[in-house]
Amino acid sequence: MQAGSPIPGGGPSRLFILRPVATTLFMAAILLAGIIGYRMLPVSALPEVDYPTIQVVTLYPGASPDVMTSAVTAPLERQLGQMSGLKQMASQSSGGASVITLQFQLTLPLDVAEQEVQAAINAASNLLPNDLPYPPIYSKVNPADPPILMLAVTSDAMPMTQIQDMVETRIAQKISQVNGVGLVTLAGGQRPAVRVKLNAQAVAAQGLDSETIRTAINNANVNSAKGSLDGPTRSVTLSANDQMKSVNDYRNLIIAYKNGSPVRLQDVATIEQGAENTKLGAWSNNTQAIVINVQRQPGANVIETTDNIRQMLPELISSLPKSVDMKILTDRTTTIRASVKDVQFELLLAIALVVMVIYLFLRNGIATLIPSIAVPLSLIGTFAVMYFCGFSVNNLTLMALTIATGFVVDDAIVVIENISRYIEQGEKPMTAALKGAGEIGFTIISLTFSLIAVLIPLLFMGDIVGRLFREFAITLAVAILISAVVSLTLTPMMCARILKPESQIKHNRFEQASGRFFEQMIAGYAVWLKRALNHPWITFGIALSTLALTALLYLMIPKGFFPSQDNGLIQGTLEAPQSISFTAMVNKQQQVSSLLLQDPAVENITTFVGVDGSNPTLNNGRLQITLKPLNQRDDRIVDIIPRLQEKVAAIPGIKLYLQPMQDLTIDTQVTRTQYQFTLQATSLDELSIWVPKLLAELKQRAELVDISSDWQDQGLIAYVKVDRDIASRLGISMAAIDNALYNAFGQRLISTIYTQANQYRIILEHDVTSTPGLAAFDNIRLNGTDGHVVPLRTIATIEQKFGPLAINHLAQFPSATFSFNVAEDASLEQAVNAVRDAAQLINMPKDISTQFQGTTLAFESALGNTLWLIAAAIIAMYIVLGILYESFIHPVTILSTLPTAGVGALLALMMAGHELDVIAIIGIILLIGIVKKNAIMMIDFALAAEREQGLSPYEAIYQACLLRFRPILMTTMAALLGALPLMLSTGVGAELRRPLGICMVGGLIMSQILTLFTTPVIYLLFDRLAHYRRNRQLSVSNTPSIDHQEPR
């Protein structure tokens, strides 16, 4: 420092202005921490907001939906339903499969939930069927969450069973070991097995029955401990040829002796190598394949995980035979990378536009350099805090930083503009920096804390929406806080060191022209401002009308939940008649796939038929359609889906439901459409009455399309009605009848072959190729007590009935779920109201309850909290401003700017054809924080002028408006241009970003036009009100008390 008397002023910035080295190193530390944090942050599409979800799957081949419900699902549900922290339990019981999906509270750690699930399964194990071939298996993955990577393994030369075996032993295990992989599942299950197909006539001719053969196979194939021999000097382990491992071994197996001659298994059956389940299949572009689905661990870095898998793929492919081909079908990180890249570009564009605006207003290249350093520094420093908070680089955090570009530059602009004003008045840069920074310090603190206060309610939002925007709010708040620190430290220090005195600044023609332009703008504003101040009630009336208009527009605008994204992936469900066979369903699926592949926007299609954890019934097929990249197709996904559905509509007997896959997954089940509504009753009989009635009513509603229900009660059932008296007289038990039927038609798993690498099942069934349909029952024979073979038909009749294909439970009670999409000209709010009206119109009994599910339930919760959220933001800001200004009145003046922003935002959304969704609401809340800064800058200077210069309120606010016009215009333009790239975005994930940009731009334009006039008018009106109250209180205090009045 130079010798001499110290220059006064500087406020909180003084120390940093006078110590440039310390300030520079402090900023370098922030920069370094931010860079390190950025390199360590994971990358994802959205913040980690998934509900802890666990799926319990139990397979019991051959069991009917009724048996699965009563014998498997119900015992498990009774135990699982007792767990603490359980939010919802839903189940599907279909032919041979029970799937229970458990959704826990967001606050419950998944590991804790896993332990409770395992304990509940153990508790229920004694109640499950003894011949259950597989124990219940649970997985810590949401079944509705799409895989991050899908691979298809195909071959023209090898059977699918061999491919499945190779995939299980060579590929799936290796991929499972990659860090970040949560679960690897195989679709199209063709696990190798030995299939024993009994010839019913040959079995009967030998006087045998299927149960005798099953017992013989079981006894012939064992793999158990045999002990060891211990001698004086050595020990010998015992082994034997107790296992039969090849098809030939089973063909030659002696199952009985007749007339002294052996009866071998090949004499009464066909034994072949085949698939464990012949009613499962997956196809990639109509080529049968084993599809590998890779799902992530919660919180894993999706891009890093996928990259690690891709790096090991060449090695995995080289380990396969040349006739086997493995390719990537879908890679979700492709769209995640593209989306994040687009947002990063928009962030850089926002920074460039903001810097351009600063130069345009300051007309000084060196002065422009200061915020050009301050803005990136504030944003980069935020990454360090994001890392310590466990956040990720995702669309929302990058959107927060993009919006923050306009926010963080505000502080720098306010400081630079105020210091520049003193330099233009002839002060030296050091003196100007100390005076300007000291004068503006309180304003910066007011702007910062009032803006952060707006974000506080977002942190207290409950449920999944609150979790989703917590990262957004904290990232934005941290960026704003770091910006305030930079603006009070680095910015004034750089102004003092690099700005030149006014006498040394030479402006070029452009800078001179822009200076004259702004002077003319200020002069024009002064004229209109005087008119507004001279006609206060007209201006005040305009301000009040914006409040009424905001309320009216809020009631009018269509409301939605979350923008539908175009991620290039379409999830489809193909529904066929309930009695369709597996073979017929495969043919239909292939026909649909061939038709869809002809569409120019489709890149590949993966299809699946069969019953597993995600597909409950045989008449439902699953499709996943991968579209070409956005830049290689002409249409967006919302236009492609109707086109594909229209093509398939020409195929008779099937219905195709399609929906775009989303980054945000709230549902716990794979559904036909985007939205669900559930009926819950005490019995299936009640549902059978009211489900068709409600379905018919819903189809009358114009707001709804693609309406369907998972209620399927028209499946064909062959009901075996046994005459128990005759059966008892012949010595045939019901257990023997069930076993005979199961052996014949259940693909019964009767034994296991153990090898060093895997385990393979022995499947028993009847060969029914020559006796299709109900005629197959004619060949069922049972052994009576006298040794005679008894045909099933002599003790039972076969009746054909209709029954449920699947039985669904919600919270252990029977339920039916309706799926629907929203019509093109309707909003989600209108669709929800239409569903609710339809349910009320049919007058269902009180014991039938209704409930929206998944996305629709989250929408209702978010919609109900919208007004409370906005009110909380306003109240939080009022409290902070009241504390800062020590006034009840001035915060009201500042908050009077808010309705103008609301009108602008809602009008912009309506003009752009967008719904008021969660993203748009966040935009409105951010506007609340932005637009009040105009009033803060005006009122701060007006109060200072009244206090320090002795000006009247009129003169003070008039002078403040003119002095602050340039920084107000600069900060508004900076915030507007920061949001402009979001509003104009067209790349991957643009649907998510655009509503936020539209709200910000519309609200800023409207508020900028009106608040420049309404704020000073309201300031004066409140000042007159305060003056009137003071005078009245003074007159009351001067009036003598009655007790002291002298008597007349």
From Swiss-Prot:
One of its GO terms (molecular function) is xenobiotic transmembrane transporter activity. Signal peptide: none annotated. Part of a tripartite efflux system composed of MdtA, MdtB and MdtC. MdtB forms a heteromultimer with MdtC. Pfam families: ACR_tran. It comes from Photorhabdus laumondii subsp. laumondii (strain DSM 15139 / CIP 105565 / TT01) (Photorhabdus luminescens subsp. laumondii). It is found in: Cell inner membrane. Keywords: Cell inner membrane, Cell membrane, Membrane, Transmembrane, Transmembrane helix, Transport. It is a multi-pass membrane protein. Belongs to the resistance-nodulation-cell division (RND) (TC 2.A.6) family. MdtB subfamily. SUPFAM superfamilies: Multidrug efflux transporter AcrB pore domain, PN1, PN2, PC1 and PC2 subdomains, Multidrug efflux transporter AcrB TolC docking domain, DN and DC subdomains, Multidrug efflux transporter AcrB transmembrane domain. The chain crosses the membrane at residues 15-37, 345-362, 366-388, 395-417, 437-459, 472-494, 535-557, 867-889, 909-931, 968-990, 1000-1022. It comes from the Bacteria. This is Multidrug resistance protein MdtB. GO terms for cellular component: plasma membrane.
